Amino acid sequence: MNVESSTLIALKRQVAAMERRAPVGKAVRVATGHGDIDSALGGGIARGRLHEIFAAEQGDAGSATGFAGMLSIRLGGGVVWLREESAVRGGGHLHGPGLVEIGVDPTRLLLGFLPDPLSVLRAAADVVRCAGVGVAVIELHRDLKVLDLTASRRLALAAEESGVAALLLRIAATPVASAADTRWAVRSCASQPLPANAPGHPTFDLELLRQRGRGADGRWQVEWNREQAVFTSPTPSGAVVAVPARRPAAAPIPLRRAG
């Protein structure tokens, strides 16, 4: 049995366990908490749809990853995060303490590592069809021939049928034609320090590049409020602290992985 097959078997077994849990709510759209963004989206980010998240530049990869994690929290349910093994070798593991810091529950996060982009897409098609999954994050790096319009349509149709939110996280990649409901560009931004000069809330520059069926787009600077698990506008302040594009290594959080 090859690595891809054994990983998929383990992944399907653990996803099946997710499906036995309480189902995700039936709301079609979930508010982000940021009024202007929710207005542009017609009420919020849609479940049962494919959404693309692009790191605007290579140095914005951490911010784009954080945004995907935060959207997963807003959308609710168990999260299956699929990555290429080369992403781990090239950029390291997901920063467990950082995910916990923004509010991700490690017990509701399942990581799947696949040997190549095609394997990631095959696994994603299976995961997105599982109605018991809340969110599938499909992380792919570089421009890829296998991720064409047809491949994105498969993911979009699977999401529509199951109600799972599929977040296609693209690092060091150029946007191309796709069946995604929304497409976002994420840029790193400075955060406002909290009282006593404590580190501020994560802050991003978000740009809605396109939205299927709606002409609205826009660009906003937003903060993530972990306590309320919502996006808000930054509180004006005279001082800012820079948010590093990449965090230093830290002790790993025990995140579940398939395989």
Give, region by region, the residue ranges found by the protein language model.
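Phosphate-binding/switch region of NTP-binding enzymes
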Residues: 168-239, 247-248
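Conserved inter-motif catalytic segment of the P-loop NTP-binding fold
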Residues: 77-134, 139
